[in-house]
Amino acid sequence: MTDLHTDVERYLRYLSVERQLSPITLLNYQRQLEAIINFASENGLQNWQQCDAAMVRNFAVRSRRKGLGAASLALRLSALRSFFDWLVSQNELKANPAKGVSAPKTPRHLPKNIDVDDINRLLDIDINDPLAVRDRAMLEVMYGAGLRLSELVGLDIKHLDLESGEVWVMGKGSKERRLPIGRNALSWIEHWLDLRDLFGSEDDALFLSKLGKRISARNVQKRFAEWGIKQGLNNHVHPHKLRHSFATHMLESSGDLRGVQELLGHANLSTTQIYTHLDFQHLASVYDAAHPRAKRGK
């Protein structure tokens, strides 16, 4: 029966020699496992056979109390589970004591949406050259359809149905969806198509760079940020913020969570619930209008 340090050293050699992990990854494993060694030693453990699920849970609680974030704790527990799995494979343990212990879910931080007045100011750009027309069209489509950045740059001309005012989008997991894009976006797309051949006509992409190639995601991010500054917006403008604003404004206006889910291309409704938020004033007005106990004087 070996001691705490010896087993960890053997495991790190296994990761280095047999798994051929990088020095940085090995160092991360070492740091995570040193933390559990220290905790186990403080609690009087002399070998890993004395470790049980209760001790692992106490270790997780203590780590959180000492300020370790949820994501970092998840990584620490993952390293610990892998180590114990290896001990089981070496017949040093009968079962993995960390198997049923999980870290709290990492909170998802939502980007701030752009309010409607600022959206209108952003879209009211001075059209003085073909690239500005292209950018206006991209902004209109991004906000008008709530696209992901990858979906915007992946658009081809053939994906447009100008008669119906719709666009075919290839989303995550190669899932295709058909979306309305609105009159304003449609008008600016047509305006851009009149100028597009100035940059080239061989590429199938809807939006081209000044070199005549499909515009890159990085270029879109850069141009949107520049327009945000030019238009005097206080918040940094990036594509995801436009998608988030689309979702928020649609939900505030319609209250149709399932409809917004379909428009965004979310596989699960829970994603839409996290992704969108209603401001308190809107929620209060919905409550006052709909809840039986809120209808005062009736």
Swiss-Prot record:
GO terms for cellular component: cytoplasm. Transmembrane segments: none annotated. Keywords: Cell cycle, Cell division, Chromosome partition, Cytoplasm, DNA integration, DNA recombination, DNA-binding. The keyword Cytoplasm applies. It comes from the Bacteria. Residues 2-88 form the Core-binding (CB) domain. It is found in: Cytoplasm. The active site is at R148, K172, H240, R243, H266, Y275 (o-(3'-phospho-dna)-tyrosine intermediate). Gene3D superfamilies: 1.10.150.130, Intergrase catalytic core. Pfam families: Phage_int_SAM_1 (PF02899), Phage_integrase (PF00589). One of its GO terms (biological process) is chromosome segregation. GO terms for molecular function: DNA binding; tyrosine-based site-specific recombinase activity. FtsK may regulate the catalytic switch between XerC and XerD in the heterotetrameric complex during the two steps of the recombination process. PROSITE patterns: CB, TYR_RECOMBINASE. Residues 109-288 form the Tyr recombinase domain. Belongs to the 'phage' integrase family. XerC subfamily. PANTHER family: PHAGE INTEGRASE-RELATED, TYROSINE RECOMBINASE XERC. Site-specific tyrosine recombinase, which acts by catalyzing the cutting and rejoining of the recombining DNA molecules. Binds cooperatively to specific DNA consensus sequences that are separated from XerD binding sites by a short central region, forming the heterotetrameric XerC-XerD complex that recombines DNA substrates. The complex is essential to convert dimers of the bacterial chromosome into monomers to permit their segregation at cell division. It also contributes to the segregational stability of plasmids. In the complex XerC specifically exchanges the top DNA strands. Forms a cyclic heterotetrameric complex composed of two molecules of XerC and two molecules of XerD, in which XerC interacts with XerD via its C-terminal region, XerD interacts with XerC via its C-terminal region and so on. This is Tyrosine recombinase XerC. It comes from Escherichia coli O157:H7.
